[in-house]
Amino acid sequence: MYKRQVYGNDKCEPKLLVVIMASTREHYLNLEFTELELSIIETARKLSDISGIDYKLIRYCKDESELFCVQYINYKTKRYKNIQMNHLAKVFAKYGIGTTLSETSETKKYLNDKISSAFHKWQREVLGNNITASDIDLIKFENDEMSAIYELKRSVVPIDKWKPYSDDYANFKLISKFADMANLEFKIVYNQRRKNPYCDDISKLKLFSFDYRENRSNYCDTVILEDFLKGRYHG
């Protein structure tokens, strides 16, 4: 699992970009970066440069049943230090994300299971509900330069009836603000998931923009995949 995640405060203001990597035990112990990891990290570095938002690299071992600590990585030097989970909370707190813990705060175990990773259990429990956090799902490049960020949504709701849910507006607001800071286009892209046979139908896509100033989504267009990939859509 590799994620580029934007974290913000309770006002949906972007504060930190974090690359979260769940590695095998072999890569974790040897601090070896895969080609995919290097690509994701480099994209995060560029996003940090153009948005002005700091970025951090965090890696944990997905093969361990319990999570006590993570690798806190300096990408430039390829050096890292293992930090306990309560110390990681203080890193986030410096950016106004979550609650500042005391030096004597107990380090807990966080368990990996098939449903949810230990890292995300830690995030929910320690950083709390007064934050916003959202993955960067898809980035568009034109002439080797980033031009857009897309939030991907899917469900079994027919494409002509689906519209963004208000429960997701906080995340849309966070990512659209981040995209604005980076001078990138932001769109919500929906595809329908079929039940029989079970598959994601991406032959047709429905696009929405999101105005974080007015906290509302606006329908843009419904296009075939080829037109989407070539940027041929309204809005």
What are the residue ranges of the model-derived segments?
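Charged phosphate-binding loop/patch that engages nucleotide di/tri-phosphates or the phosphate backbone
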Residues: S105, D221-G235
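Surface-exposed cleft-lining segments at the edges of enzyme active sites
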Residues: T24-L31, K109, F119-L127, S155-K163
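Acidic-basic catalytic patches of nuclease active cores, encompassing PD-(D/E)XK
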Residues: K3-K11, T43-Y55, Y60-A133, G235
